[in-house]
């Protein structure tokens, strides 16, 4: 009986509460709807991604086309949270995460002139490379680099030396009769001993026979043609001397 009494009392209390709620709220569906909307029951709660969760710590950097007139500057909003501050520092220290388009670079690059090629006719009077700011700050002197001689200059110098030697040979009487002009065939000079022996033979006989020419050539270490030519020239010289004597007389 005690259990029945307690259950009856519970049901009566529940019914009395429902009777009190009924005049305030017209229907149970309305009560459920208001309760759900108040505490967010069936409303859709989409999960936020990592990018939206940390959107307050850093903002996405947008790339702008570089403006040659004025450099663009980017301002980042950072929060003061401890956990967000860790991400802020890590992202701020990462140089790859920043877009440096349009920002003036800290280091200035200077163009370097190419060095002239060896053998070329052109040569710059100044140094082959532009001085750096550090060199200018240290009062470094700019030295001139001498121009290397080209192949054409070397050829001209060689021609000049050859012409000078030819002029010396032409002015020197002792070497003029030994060396002929470069256009003609080079003569074969005879030694003093050879000339003396040929002169003796010429005094005995102006016209040597063939056998005697071979014998003289063998004794003087000459060829038969050389002995023959020498005798021909010697006869022409003797005739010229005779003509000159007749004119003088």
From Swiss-Prot:
Give the originating organism: Takifugu rubripes
Matching InterPro entries, A to Z? Answer: Abd-B_homeobox_TF, HD, HD_metazoa, Homeobox_CS, Homeodomain-like_sf, Hox9_activation_N, HXA9/HXB9/HXC9
Q: Name one GO biological process term.
A: DNA-templated transcription
Q: Briefly, what is this protein's role?
A: Sequence-specific transcription factor which is part of a developmental regulatory system that provides cells with specific positional identities on the anterior-posterior axis.
Where does it sit, as one GO cellular component term? Answer: nucleus
One Gene Ontology term of the molecular function aspect: RNA polymerase II cis-regulatory region sequence-specific DNA binding
Q: DNA-binding region at which residues?
A: 183-242
Task: Give the family from UniProt.
Answer: Belongs to the Abd-B homeobox family.
Chain spans, region Disordered: 152-183
Q: Where is the composition biased (Basic and acidic residues)?
A: 154-170
The protein, known as: Homeobox protein Hox-A9b
**UniProtKB keywords:** Developmental protein, DNA-binding, Homeobox, Nucleus, Transcription, Transcription regulation
Q: Enumerate the PANTHER family for this protein.
A: AGAP004664-PA, HOMEOBOX PROTEIN HOX-A9
Q: Where does the protein end up? A: Nucleus
- Report the Pfam families cross-referenced here: Homeodomain, Hox9_act
Primary localisation category? nucleus
Keyword Chloroplast assigned: no
According to the entry, what is the taxonomic lineage of the organism? Eukaryota, Metazoa, Chordata, Craniata, Vertebrata
């Amino acid at each position: 009986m005690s259990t029945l009494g307690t259950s009856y009392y519970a049901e009566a209390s529940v019914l009395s509460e429902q009777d009190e709620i009924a005049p305030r709220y017209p229907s149970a569906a309305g009560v459920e709807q208001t309760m759900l909307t108040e505490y967010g029951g069936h409303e859709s709660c989409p999960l936020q991604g990592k990018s939206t969760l940390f959107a307050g710590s850093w903002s996405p950097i947008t790339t702008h086309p570089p403006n040659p007139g004025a450099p663009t500057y980017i301002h980042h909003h950072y929060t003061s949270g401890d956990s967000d501050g860790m991400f802020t520092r890590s992202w701020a220290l990462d140089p790859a995460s920043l877009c440096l388009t349009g920002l003036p670079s800290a280091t200035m690059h200077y163009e370097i002139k190419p060095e002239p090629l060896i053998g070329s006719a052109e040569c710059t009077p100044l140094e082959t490379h532009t001085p750096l700011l550090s060199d200018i700050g240290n009062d470094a002197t700019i030295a001139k680099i001498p121009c290397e001689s080209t192949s054409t200059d070397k050829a001209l110098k060689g021609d000049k030396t050859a012409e000078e030697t030819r002029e010396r040979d032409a002015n020197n009487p002792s070497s003029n009769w030994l060396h002929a002009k470069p256009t003609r065939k080079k003569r074969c000079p005879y030694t003093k001993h050879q000339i003396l022996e040929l002169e003796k033979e010429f005094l005995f006989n102006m016209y040597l026979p063939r056998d005697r020419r071979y014998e003289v050539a063998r004794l003087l270490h000459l060829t038969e043609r050389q002995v023959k030519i020498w005798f021909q020239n010697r006869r022409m010289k003797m005739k010229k001397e005779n003509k000159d004597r007749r004119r003088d007389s």
